[in-house]
Amino acid sequence: MTVLEYVAMLAALVLVPWLAARRLAEPVDGSDPRAAFEAARARHARRALLRRADASALPVLTTSRRPARTVACVVPLREIVGSVDRGPHPFDRRFDPSADTAWARFAAVLRARNDGVELPPVLLHQGCDGYYVLDGHHRVAVARALGDTETRAEVAVDPSPCA
């Protein structure tokens, strides 16, 4: 193996994944809803290729209990880890859109944010390993795509979330 071949192999093994990982962390520009949606979809596809696994699975919390009250708070987006069992969602575990079915609502939420509309807080359920979305999947997706670090939320209070 020549030095040039060795350097090329090293670049493919180290540099390319490093550059891809940096690109995965970049927030999208919110001025064009279609471009923002496509950038988030592309980020989902790159992440799936890098992991060589199905990155489309959004963790689901199965619960039959519906807490009676909620508490208003600000929640770090990194602590939102999945969805409460309400059917399939067109997002991966980082809330990047994994299907075109998310486009219309994603665009509507992004336009509302760009127009200065105050969106309602997301409704979350606290589990043992983080928060699960009851309502507001598209708001979480747009917030993450734009690089926000936290979001306003109503957290469903459960006296024993890990029981």
Language-model segments: residues:
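Membrane-helix interface and helix-disruption motif detector
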Residues: 1-3
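Short, charged/polar connector segments at secondary-structure boundaries
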Residues: 5-148
